[in-house]
C-alpha cells in the first residue's frame, strides 16, 4: 500500500505478544488497535535507531465480540457463518514511531454489511481463497473475491485494506518525510 502511494518502505515483522496485549487491554477497539500498532512499531524501532517506523493493526468486531485471524479453515468457515447477515466493524490503526517514541497515531473504523451467506458459498469461497484469507482478520481480501461477501460498505477504502493511509500521508508530510 505504501509503495503504491509512492512511499518507499521495507516490511519488518514485529516480535510482540499480541495475545497478552489483547488479554490485558480494557479499552475499546480503536484504543486496542492503536496499542497494537504502536507496540509493533516500537519493537521494530528498537532494531532501527534513527528510522521512522510505521506500525499498523486491524480488529474485527460483531457487536461486543472481537474476532482474531482464524486458526484453521474450519474456524474461518465458522467466522463467515457468524458474519452472515451482520454488520461487522473493522477498526484499523496506524502508528508512527522514532527511536522508541510514539510520535503520532490514528485509528479509523469502517462498517461492512455482510450479505446472507449460504454454506455452499462459504465452502466455494474458502476453496478458492484459503489459505490466503487466513492471514486476514475478517477472512476476506477486499481486493479479491472477498468483495462478494458484502451488500454495502461504509468507510474509507484504505482503512478496510488495513491502514488509514490518507491520515498517515498527512503525518508524513507534516514531518517532512514526503514532499508536501
Write out the residue ranges for each language-model feature.
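N-terminal G-site helix/loop of the GST-like fold
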Residues: 1-13, 174-178
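Short glycine-rich, Thr/Ser-proximal phosphate-binding strand/loop in the N-terminal lobe
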Residues: 6-24, 102-109
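Anionic-ligand binding patches
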Residues: 24-180
Amino acid at each position: 500500500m505504501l509503495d503504491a502511494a509512492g512511499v518507499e518502505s521495507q516490511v519488518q515483522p514485529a516480535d510482540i505478544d499480541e495475545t497478552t496485549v489483547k488479554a490485558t487491554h480494557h479499552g475499546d477497539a480503536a484504543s486496542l488497535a492503536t496499542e497494537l500498532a504502536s507496540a509493533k512499531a516500537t519493537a521494530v524501532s528498537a532494531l532501527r535507531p534513527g528510522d521512522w517506523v510505521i506500525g499498523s493493526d486491524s480488529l474485527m468486531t460483531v457487536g461486543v465480540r472481537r474476532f482474531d485471524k482464524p486458526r484453521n479453515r474450519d474456524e474461518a468457515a465458522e467466522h463467515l457463518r457468524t458474519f452472515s447477515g451482520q454488520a461487522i466493524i473493522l477498526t484499523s490503526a496506524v502508528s508512527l514511531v522514532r527511536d522508541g517514541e510514539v510520535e503520532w497515531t490514528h485509528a479509523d473504523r469502517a462498517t461492512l454489511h455482510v450479505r446472507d451467506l449460504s454454506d455452499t458459498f462459504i465452502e466455494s469461497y474458502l476453496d478458492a481463497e484459503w489459505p490466503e484469507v487466513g492471514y486476514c482478520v475478517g477472512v476476506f481480501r477486499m481486493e479479491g473475491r472477498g468483495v462478494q461477501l458484502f451488500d454495502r460498505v461504509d468507510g474509507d477504502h484504505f482503512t478496510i485494506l488495513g491502514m488509514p493511509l490518507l491520515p498517515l500521508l498527512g503525518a508524513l508530510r507534516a514531518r517532512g518525510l514526503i514532499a508536501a
